[in-house]
Design a protein with these regions (language model features):
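Ferredoxin-type iron-sulfur electron-transfer modules in oxidoreductases and energy-metabolism complexes
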Residues: 1-7, 149-221
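Hydrophobic alpha-helical positions that pack around
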Residues: 1-107, 119
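Active-site loop ensemble at the mouth of alpha/beta enzyme cores that anchors a bound cofactor
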Residues: 29-41, 144-161
């Protein structure tokens, strides 16, 4: 790249396990081990990471911001967004929208503005029944909460989280029980099995939601 810095870049393709989004599970996978989280402490990556060597773990979104910051400076980057949530972030928009995709936007934009301007609105001009603000594990918002700002604080103050930045819009015709079952089934399948509440709990949740979705729900459910 025209500099005096010399380094090797190796691209290692993972198998796509959800748990390997956790940094220590990712390191286990790179070492050829079972993809499951390590105990922290003592296995903080910066202390005992890949092959027990100090390791810096960053995701692609973080790295993608580095060139702009190097060129323009951190102070300029912090002028983007709002206080407490500065800069930009990459959000993945999917569901019942006209223009699904990955978008880099300034923090502080409302979910409604995001969907209307970049997402092209909801398909067939339907209303939003509910939406997921930050990935499958984030608590959902109602369709009348589109004015919530895409900031850490505003989302947290409304009892959810930005999480992975995966925004999923569900229109007025969506069966929310079936949608919840689909997500729970995903977690049941992707559980690494290390911890009992996740390993057993997600399977039970899947069975309960399956009963409700098929009309066999119980009062206790």
């Amino acid at each position: 790249f025209g500099s005096e810095i010399d380094l090797d870049i190796v691209v290692h393709l993972g198998a796509g396990a959800y748990i390997c989004g956790e940094e220590t599970a990712l390191l286990n996978s790179l070492e050829g081990r079972r993809g499951e989280p390590r105990l922290k402490p003592p296995y903080f990556p910066a202390v005992k990471g890949l092959y027990m060597k100090p390791t810096l773990v960053n995701n692609v979104e973080t790295i993608s911001s580095v060139p702009w910051i190097i060129e323009n400076g951190g102070e300029e980057y912090n002028k983007l967004g709002v206080e407490g949530s500065t800069g930009t972030r990459i959000f993945s928009l999917s569901g019942h929208v006209n223009n699904p995709g990955n978008y880099e936007i300034e923090m502080g934009t409302s979910f409604g503005e995001f969907v209307d301007t970049l997402g092209g609105g909801i398909r067939n001009n339907k209303k939003v029944k509910a939406y997921i603000p930050g990935g499958a594990s984030a608590p959902w918002f109602r369709g009348d909460q589109l004015d919530i700002k895409m900031t850490i604080d505003d989302v947290a103050n409304n009892n959810s989280m930005l999480g992975s930045g995966a925004v999923v819009m569900m229109d007025e015709d969506t069966n929310l029980v079936s949608a919840a079952k689909s997500i729970v089934s995903f977690f049941a399948h992707e559980s690494c099995g290390q911890c009992t509440p996740c390993r057993e709990g997600t399977t039970w949740l899947e069975m309960i939601l399956d009963r409700i979705a098929s009309g066999r729900g119980r009062t206790s459910d």
